[in-house]
C-alpha cells in the first residue's frame, strides 16, 4: 500500500532533509508553505516574512548541520519554517500562546536556535562573536547570519560587517532582499557574472593564484595582485550590487533567486568551501505563495488570523464595534494639530503603520520622516530639527527606544531640546513576548534630567498630553501609552492643557490610597470596587506625571492615610513606585508603602489576560495584595 503521508510528515529533524533530492526539497518547501498559511489563518502570527524564506529555510537545513552549525536569524520573525523543520512542528499550534513556543528563536527552546533574537540588525554581530569564539577554541562549525526584511537599514549591521571584514572569520551573511532595496542588475551579463563567481573552478583557481602570488615577495607580484583585484572589483561593480560589501571585506556573491531551490543549494554548498567572510545576496518575495500577502506585504507582515486561505478575506468578528486604539488616537490628534501648525514633524523608525504615523504620512508627506531601523539616528535627527525651531514628534516603541538611550540623554536632554517622544507599546504587549514588552521605559527615563514623563489613563488624556507637550512644556517630553484599545470614552474635539506635574483624584475614600500611573487607572478602579465589597474604602489618584511628580498631592494624601499603594505597568525596579518611595523617604513620612508593578524578571509571551494574571496585575490580584497589605497579613 502506498504511503499517503506528505513529505513533511516524514521530517522529524533536519537530518531527514540530507537525503532529499532537489525536486523533493521543492515539494517539501511547498508543503511547509501550505501548512504555514493554514497555521496563521487559525492562530495568527508573523506571516509574510516566513513565506518569503521558505525555500531558503529548507535549503539551509539540507546543506548545513544545525545541531552543530549555527544559523542566526535576524529579528527572528521569519523563522517559522525553521521551527517546523527542527522538531517543533507538532507544537506550532502553540506558537506565541501562553505556555507555548515563542514566535522568535530562543536558545533555551531548541539547540537549533543558535541565538535569541527579536530586535533588528543584531545577527551579524552575534555571528561574528560566535565565529571568533569558535576560532579561539579550534572548532570548525559553520556560522551563518540571515538578515534582511529591512534589517540592513540598521547601522549595527554595517558596524558588524566592517568588523567582520577586519577579523576575516569564516562567516556567511545571507542578505534576504525582499524589498529590492539593493537593486539587482538585470540581463545576460548579470546572470553570467553570478554563475562565474559561484563557479568552483573559478574560486579554486582564484585561491591558488592568490597563494602563489603571496609567495612571490616582489614588486611585480604586488602589482599583478593589485591589477587583478581591480579588474575583479570593476567587473562586480559594473554587473552586481556587491561592491559596497567587498569594500567592507566580505566577498560578495549573487544576487540569486531565493525561490530557486537548485540555485540555493548550489550556492550554499559553494559557500561552505570558502574560509573567509562572505555575503550571499538572495532575492525573495515577501509573502511568496499567498497572493494577498504578495500584493500587500505590509498589511500581511503579521496577522491575527481568521482569514480565508485562498482569498485572504478576514471573517468579521461578531460583537460591539471596537473602541479606538491608543495608536489611532495619537495619530489622528497629531494630524489634527499639524494641519494647523507647519512646525510639527513626525518621525518613525520603520514603524509608520504600527504607530499610526501613516495617517500623518498621507496628510503631510513632506513633514513625515521614516528613518529606517535606526532609532538612535531618529532621536538625534529629531534633536536637529528641534534646534532649528521645529516641533518634532518621534514615535518609537518602548522596547526599541532602549536602543537610543544615549541619544535621548546626550543629544536631546542635555541640550534641553523640545522633542516629543511618543512611546508606543509601553507595558506588556502580549504574544510577542519578552523581546517586545515595554517594561523598562519608566525606569531608564526616570533618571534623565529635564525630561518630562507622562502617561495617559485614557484616549482623551493622550490627546491632551500630546497638546500639552507641544505647546505648554519647554524641553523634552516622553508620553508612554500601551498597545491596544482605549476605554471607549467619548473624546472632546478640543484640547485641554494639563498642568505639568499635577495629578487628579479618581475616587475619594477613607482607607488605603492607590496612586496609579497610566492605564493602570482602570485596574485600580476595578480593584477598588472589589475591595469596597469587602468593606475597604479606597482612595484613588491618577498621577498623570512621573516627572515632575505631584509631591503636593502625595503629601496631602499621606497626611491622613496609613497605607499607600503604587500601581504601574512597568518594572518594579526604578519606576513610578520607586519615585514615590524616594519622596516618602526624603519627606520622612511614616506612611507604609506597597509597590505593585511588573516583577524583576523577563515576562513570557501569551495573551494579555494570561500575562496580567501571571504578573499579578489583574484587578483580583491587585485587590488581594492591597487587602493583605492593609489588614497586615501580607507575607
Curated annotation (Swiss-Prot):
PROSITE patterns: TRANSKETOLASE_1. Its EC number is 2.2.1.7. Keywords: Isoprene biosynthesis, Magnesium, Metal-binding, Thiamine biosynthesis, Thiamine pyrophosphate, Transferase. Its cofactor is Mg(2+); thiamine diphosphate. Belongs to the transketolase family. DXPS subfamily. Homodimer. This is 1-deoxy-D-xylulose-5-phosphate synthase.
Amino acid at each position: 500500500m502506498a504511503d499517503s503521508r506528505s513529505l513533511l510528515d516524514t521530517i522529524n529533524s533536519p537530518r531527514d532533509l540530507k537525503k532529499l533530492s532537489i525536486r523533493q526539497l521543492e515539494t517539501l518547501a511547498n508543503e511547509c508553505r501550505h501548512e504555514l498559511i493554514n497555521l496563521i489563518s487559525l492562530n495568527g502570527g508573523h506571516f509574510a516574512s516566513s513565506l518569503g524564506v521558505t525555500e531558503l529555510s529548507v535549503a539551509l537545513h539540507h546543506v548545513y548541520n544545525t545541531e552543530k552549525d549555527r544559523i542566526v536569524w535576524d529579528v527572528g520573525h521569519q523563522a517559522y519554517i525553521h521551527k517546523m523543520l527542527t522538531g517543533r512542528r507538532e507544537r506550532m499550534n502553540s506558537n506565541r500562546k501562553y505556555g507555548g513556543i515563542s514566535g522568535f528563536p530562543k536558545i533555551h527552546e531548541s539547540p537549533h536556535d543558535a541565538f535569541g533574537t527579536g530586535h533588528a540588525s543584531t545577527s551579524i554581530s552575534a555571528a561574528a562573536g560566535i565565529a571568533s569564539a569558535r576560532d579561539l577554541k579550534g572548532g570548525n562549525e559553520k556560522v551563518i547570519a540571515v538578515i534582511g526584511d529591512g534589517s540592513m537599514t540598521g547601522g549595527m549591521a554595517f558596524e558588524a560587517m566592517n568588523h567582520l571584514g577586519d577579523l576575516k572569520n569564516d562567516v556567511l551573511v545571507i542578505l534576504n532582499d525582499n524589498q529590492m532595496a539593493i537593486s539587482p542588475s538585470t540581463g545576460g551579463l548579470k546572470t553570467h557574472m553570478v554563475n562565474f563567481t559561484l563557479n568552483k573552478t573559478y574560486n579554486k583557481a582564484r585561491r591558488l593564484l592568490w597563494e602563489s602570488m603571496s609567495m612571490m615577495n616582489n614588486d611585480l607580484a604586488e602589482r599583478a595582485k593589485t591589477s587583478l583585484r581591480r579588474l575583479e572589483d570593476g567587473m562586480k561593480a559594473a554587473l552586481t550590487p556587491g561592491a559596497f560589501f567587498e569594500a567592507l571585506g566580505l566577498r560578495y556573491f549573487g544576487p540569486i533567486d531565493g525561490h530557486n531551490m537548485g540555485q540555493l543549494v548550489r550556492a550554499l554548498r559553494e559557500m561552505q568551501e570558502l574560509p573567509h567572510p562572505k555575503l550571499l545576496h538572495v532575492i525573495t518575495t515577501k509573502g511568496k505563495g499567498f497572493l494577498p500577502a504578495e500584493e500587500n506585504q505590509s498589511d500581511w507582515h503579521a496577522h491575527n488570523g481568521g482569514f480565508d486561505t485562498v482569498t485572504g478575506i478576514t471573517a468579521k468578528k461578531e460583537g460591539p464595534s471596537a473602541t479606538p486604539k491608543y495608536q489611532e488616537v495619537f495619530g489622528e490628534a497629531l494630524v489634527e494639530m499639524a494641519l494647523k501648525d507647519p512646525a510639527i514633524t513626525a518621525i518613525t523608525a520603520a514603524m509608520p503603520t504600527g504607530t499610526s504615523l501613516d495617517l500623518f504620512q498621507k496628510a503631510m508627506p513632506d513633514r513625515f520622516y521614516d528613518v529606517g531601523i535606526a532609532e538612535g539616528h531618529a532621536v538625534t535627527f529629531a534633536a536637529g530639527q528641534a534646534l532649528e525651531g521645529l516641533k518634532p514628534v518621534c514615535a518609537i516603541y518602548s522596547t526599541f527606544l532602549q536602543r537610543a538611550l544615549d541619544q535621548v540623554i546626550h543629544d536631546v536632554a542635555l541640550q534641553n531640546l523640545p522633542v516629543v517622544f511618543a512611546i508606543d507599546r509601553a507595558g506588556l504587549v502580549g504574544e510577542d513576548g519578552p523581546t517586545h514588552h515595554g517594561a523598562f521605559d519608566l525606569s531608564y527615563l526616570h533618571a534623565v534630567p529635564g525630561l518630562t514623563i507622562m502617561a495617559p489613563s485614557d484616549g482623551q488624556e493622550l490627546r491632551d498630553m500630546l497638546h500639552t507637550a507641544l505647546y505648554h512644556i519647554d524641553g523634552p517630553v516622553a508620553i508612554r501609552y500601551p498597545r491596544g484599545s482605549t476605554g471607549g470614552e467619548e473624546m472632546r474635539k478640543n484640547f485641554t492643557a494639563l498642568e505639568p506635574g499635577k495629578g487628579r483624584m479618581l475616587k475619594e475614600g477613607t482607607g488605603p490610597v492607590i496612586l496609579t500611573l497610566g492605564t493602570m487607572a482602570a485596574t485600580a478602579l476595578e480593584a477598588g470596587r472589589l475591595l469596597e465589597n469587602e468593606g475597604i474604602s479606597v482612595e484613588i489618584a491618577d498621577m498623570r506625571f512621573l516627572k515632575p511628580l505631584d509631591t503636593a498631592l502625595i503629601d496631602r494624601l499621606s497626611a491622613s492615610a496609613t497605607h499607600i499603594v503604587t500601581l504601574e505597568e512597568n518594572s518594579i525596579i526604578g519606576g513610578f513606585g520607586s519615585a514615590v518611595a524616594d519622596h516618602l523617604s526624603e519627606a520622612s513620612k511614616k506612611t507604609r508603602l506597597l509597590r505593585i508593578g511588573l516583577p524583576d524578571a523577563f515576562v513570557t509571551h501569551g495573551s494579555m489576560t494570561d500575562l496580567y494574571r501571571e504578573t499579578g496585575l489583574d484587578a483580583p490580584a491587585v485587590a488581594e495584595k492591597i487587602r493583605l497589605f492593609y489588614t497586615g497579613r501580607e507575607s
